[in-house]
Swiss-Prot record:
Keyword Transmembrane listed: no
Biological processes annotated in GO: carbohydrate metabolic process; glucosamine catabolic process; N-acetylglucosamine catabolic process; N-acetylneuraminate catabolic process
UniProt cross-references to CDD domains, sorted A to Z: GlcN6P_deaminase
Family: Belongs to the glucosamine/galactosamine-6-phosphate isomerase family. NagB subfamily.
Catalytic activity: alpha-D-glucosamine 6-phosphate + H2O = beta-D-fructose 6-phosphate + NH4(+)
Gene3D superfamilies referenced in this protein's UniProt entry, alphabetically: 3.40.50.1360
Species annotation: Shouchella clausii (strain KSM-K16) (Alkalihalobacillus clausii)
Superkingdom, natural source: Bacteria
Protein name: Glucosamine-6-phosphate deaminase
GO terms, molecular function: glucosamine-6-phosphate deaminase activity; identical protein binding
First-level EC class: hydrolase
């Protein structure tokens, strides 16, 4: 793993946006894997700014998001489709038909999972996958214990994950209990991975990631086996690892 240490969240966001923008500029056709949540928000803001400053088109870009809640229609303000439209898609010239998220309202969720995998394969795979990490090591919605061989699947959300996402909903009860997520193998098949880690709440997770122990009990640990991973971590996220390194 190539680890880039930065001062704070804003510097992490700027560096991530610069890396993504470079890939978009350099490629006549590119497929991005995208993430949601608090971590990538400012990365998208910075990416939009770079696109406007440089007159960069996104018409050659295709995107696949990691996950979507089950039971929320796309227009629901808490759906990940809505998140992506608000924070990125509505501000760039990417055709809507080239932006993909799992359909959490599909009549057959199993068929939707298979169809999503097939769409990724038909696109030629993901060129660069943007990731965050949960405090328990989850990537996407792949909770501890998820097989490394997993493909896109329906997952029961861990209570810890639901509580972490409750700030976006009126109450904890309103947070969906299931989601569709790319599997760990799906994520690992991306040609390049960009992992963003920020804040004290992720410090233990970053330290575990750097321990090199690969175990399904800590899903992100598999990233140590990927040949092309860049991690951008701020000082707070790196604090526990830094302390241990000096012991």
């Amino acid at each position: 793993m190539n680890i880039i240490h930065v001062k704070n969240y804003e510097e992490m966001s700027q560096k991530a946006a610069a890396l993504l923008f470079e890939r978009i500029q350099q490629s006549p056709k590119i497929t991005l894997g995208l993430a949601t949540g608090g971590t990538p928000e400012n990365t998208y803001t910075a990416l939009i700014a770079k696109a406007k400053e440089n007159g960069q088109s996104f018409s050659h870009v295709q995107t696949f998001n990691l996950d979507e809640y089950v039971g929320l229609p796309a227009e629901d303000k808490n759906s990940y489709r809505h998140y992506m439209e608000q924070r990125l898609f509505d501000h760039i010239d990417i055709p809507k038909e080239k932006t993909h998220l799992p359909n959490g309202m599909a009549p057959s969720l199993e068929e939707e999972c298979r169809a999503y995998e097939n769409m990724i394969a038909d696109a030629g795979g993901i060129d660069i996958q943007l990731l965050g990490i949960g405090s328990n090591g989850h990537i996407g919605f792949n909770e501890p214990g998820t097989p490394f061989s997993s493909k896109t699947h329906v997952v029961e959300l861990a209570e810890e994950t639901r509580k972490a996402n409750a700030r976006y909903f009126p109450t904890l009860e309103d947070v969906p209990k299931q989601a569709i997520t790319m599997g760990i193998q799906t994520i690992m098949e991306a040609k390049e991975i960009l992992l963003l880690i920020s804040g004290k709440a992720k410090a233990e997770a970053f330290a575990k990631l750097c321990s090199d122990e690969v175990t399904e009990a800590f899903p992100a640990s598999i990233l140590n086996k990927h040949p092309n991973v860049t991690v951008i971590a701020d000082e707070e996220a790196a604090s526990v690892y830094t302390q241990k390194a000096h012991l």
